[in-house]
Each structure stands twice: as C-alpha cells, then as structure tokens.
Amino acid sequence: MNNVINKEQINSFLNSWAEGVLAIGKCYLENENYTQRALIFIEKHYAFDHGSVMFKPTFTQEKIFRNDKESALSYFAGGEVPEDSGFAIKPWESINLSEVNYLIENNFSAVMGTLHLKPFDNEKISVIAFTFVLEKYNDSIKIKIHHSSEIK
C-alpha cells in the first residue's frame, strides 16, 4: 500500500479543509445543522477515528489543546468548552492560503503556511500560521498534528 502523500494531494486536502470550514459557517448562517456539518468535517479531515491526534487551535487560551473529537467539535462549532464561540461559525467569507511549504520524506508528510481569513461582518483579515502533519488511511488524508497561531 502506498502511503506517500504528494504535493498535489496536499493542495487538494488544504482546499477541502478551507472549503469545509466555510461550509460550516454557511450552515450556521442558513440556520442549518452546523454542528453536524462540523462533525462531518472533523471526521473527514482529522485522524481522531484512527488513533491519537494533537490539535492546538488558533484562538485558545484557557484550554489550549483539543486532542479529542469532542473538544475539537467545540472549537469549530462552540459548545463543550466555555471559551469556544465556534471558529467556523464566526463565520468566514473567505479563506486563502499562502506561503505553503511542504516536507515529504518516505511516508512522512507535513505542510505549513499561512491562512488569510476574512469574516463576513468586517474587512479585518486574520492571518494565521499553520502546520499540519498528515497521514494517509486507505485513500483518505487526515491530520495527525495541527498547530496554528495568529500572526499579529
């Protein structure tokens, strides 16, 4: 089985991740079940169902790490953790990637770059640096390690 993840697959995954975050926000704006959409997003993009995941989201202060599916869901859609207002239900109008760097060696794949997030309600762009360590399960790419922080 070939577990190598190439740049094209990583770029496709990054686009899917960004589109997934935007889709959660769209569900929120349209009064649809955004929590269910967030759960589907997490199951598609994160490896929680395959073992341990290390997740340090961008906007956390009290509970820094979200290393289980429930607290990741809280981060994206609000809920379990009191500080969470829901990263994906801000909501964002656009998410653009730049400065993407790849590390692909044998069966190890990592990507880092910047995300430029524009909210619907104002023009202030949030710039976030991110690092994802990726792993392939069958034909699905999932995040094993996610670290992100805001650039001010």
Model-predicted segments: where are they?
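Short beta-strand segments enriched in hydrophobic/aromatic residues
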Residues: 21, 115-117, 147
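Short, low-complexity N-terminal intrinsically disordered segments enriched in polar/charged residues
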Residues: 1-48
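Functional cores of ribonucleases/endoribonucleases
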Residues: 2, 84-122
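General N-terminal targeting signals
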Residues: 26-27, 34, 59, 119-121, ...
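Short beta-strand edge/turn micro-motifs at domain boundaries
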Residues: 104-112, 121-152
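A solvent-exposed, acidic/Ser-Thr-rich amphipathic alpha-helical stretch
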Residues: 28-100
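A broad structural signal for short, well-ordered beta-strand segments within beta-sheet-rich domains
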Residues: 5, 9, 92-94, 142-144
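Aromatic-residue detector
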Residues: 14, 72-77, 119, 130
